């Protein structure tokens, strides 16, 4: 599933084609994805101007001139693809099978935005812009990890006394929004913390020290265009590149990259997810 860096990369890729532009025509090719589309969605989108594109956790919101926002969740395999206009040097057209094109937005200026989702775990909804934060998918989310509300004091307070593994705590979207399996593995490696260690056992310094590392990993991943492991592509069809710099994720059996460490990257399963770590470096 695309995590925060991938969703932010897609948002940035959509901006040149969508922000400030009119939706000349919207087409909806099926009744639902993970959930039913809102009634008359194509009709309600057609003629609307996209005022801005923003991201909340792993969701993209397109604020529209009529006072509503189009909420987009990519799910497991969803892609927002830009085609029909040469918008940049790295434009790659439409690489996905068209039979999975579920929503198409013909934009003012000639660009076509296609929501392509082979597995159909994605979602789109329309919500009043002023009430967007109250949407059931957004209302339960914690602070953004790149925002000012997420700081060392906040995280230390949320982890204090918790008897869940630190990895599970960081994946809890109520504590911090947008983190997923890949980036939590990478953060914990840089922090020297074992994924199975209880969150409440961290010292205040250890808890506070996670915040700059979370930001560091996320910003590096955004700069690299995210991580392409299975279905993820940027809006122009380009692959992300952060997977080439993974230090532990997906490296089971390979040597630890820490200078002087003789350890080997291991894998354990926590709540059905693979956790990659160095048993020597991470305590």
Curated annotation (Swiss-Prot):
Belongs to the FPG family. Keywords: DNA damage, DNA repair, DNA-binding, Glycosidase, Hydrolase, Lyase, Metal-binding, Multifunctional enzyme, Zinc, Zinc-finger. Its cofactor is Zn(2+). A zinc finger (FPG-type) spans 247-283. InterPro entries: DNA_glyclase/AP_lyase_DNA-bd, Formamido-pyr_DNA_Glyclase, FPG_cat, MutM-like_N-ter, Ribosomal_uS13-like_H2TH, Znf_DNA_glyclase/AP_lyase. The gene is mutM. DNA binds at residues 100, 119, 162. Involved in base excision repair of DNA damaged by oxidation or by mutagenic agents. Acts as a DNA glycosylase that recognizes and removes damaged bases. Has a preference for oxidized purines, such as 7,8-dihydro-8-oxoguanine (8-oxoG). Has AP (apurinic/apyrimidinic) lyase activity and introduces nicks in the DNA strand. Cleaves the DNA backbone by beta-delta elimination to generate a single-strand break at the site of the removed base with both 3'- and 5'-phosphates. NCBIfam families: fpg (TIGR00577), PRK01103.1 (NF002211). This is Formamidopyrimidine-DNA glycosylase. It comes from the Bacteria. Binds 1 zinc ion per subunit. It catalyses: Hydrolysis of DNA containing ring-opened 7-methylguanine residues, releasing 2,6-diamino-4-hydroxy-5-(N-methyl)formamidopyrimidine; 2'-deoxyribonucleotide-(2'-deoxyribose 5'-phosphate)-2'-deoxyribonucleotide-DNA = a 3'-end 2'-deoxyribonucleotide-(2,3-dehydro-2,3-deoxyribose 5'-phosphate)-DNA + a 5'-end 5'-phospho-2'-deoxyribonucleoside-DNA + H(+). GO terms for molecular function: 8-oxo-7,8-dihydroguanine DNA N-glycosylase activity; class I DNA-(apurinic or apyrimidinic site) endonuclease activity; damaged DNA binding; zinc ion binding. Transmembrane segments: none annotated. Monomer. GO terms for biological process: base-excision repair. Its EC number is 3.2.2.23, 4.2.99.18. It holds the Pfam family H2TH. It comes from Cereibacter sphaeroides (strain ATCC 17029 / ATH 2.4.9) (Rhodobacter sphaeroides). The active site is at 2 (schiff-base intermediate with dna), 3 (proton donor), 58 (proton donor), 273 (proton donor).
